Amino acid sequence: MEKINTPGVHHITLRTSDYQRAKQFYIDDLGFEVILEKPNLFIFFAGGTAVAIRGPEASTPSNDQFNPFRVGLDHVALGCTDEEDLEKFAAKLNSLQVENTGIKVDETLGKKYIAFKDPDRISWEYYMV
């Protein structure tokens, strides 16, 4: 079978339990810039990848919470090219009281990273490339 021809991931979409809380976290707290907003949806770029955040639908369970151990998404990792940026980001997460691991070294690849959770407990990493 021939390999799929793609320049990379175009976008990811995450469902949130609270649209306004998610918007405050990603836009106001983390500083991403909204590039498109429609009812119950906003999109920002993380590097060259669009990240779409959707609010809950009528069928979204009211007490639902992300679980990285279910089949599906485990976490999202953003690339970091400067160790000073990694340290600044860690300090920002701490100042915002965002749950995080502190800067660690990945045992598999030997790269530094910090893992954190958004308000719906979706796992993210800021990872040295």
Model-derived regions, located:
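Vicinal oxygen chelate
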Residues: M1-I4, A90-V129
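N-terminal beta-strand motif that seeds the catalytic metal site of vicinal oxygen chelate
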Residues: M1-Q20, L73-V76
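A generic structural micro-feature
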Residues: I4, L36, N67-R70
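Core segments of cupin and vicinal oxygen chelate
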Residues: R15-E57
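Short, conserved charged micro-motifs
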Residues: Q20-R21, E83-K88
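A short, acidic/glycine-rich surface segment
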Residues: A58-D64, G102
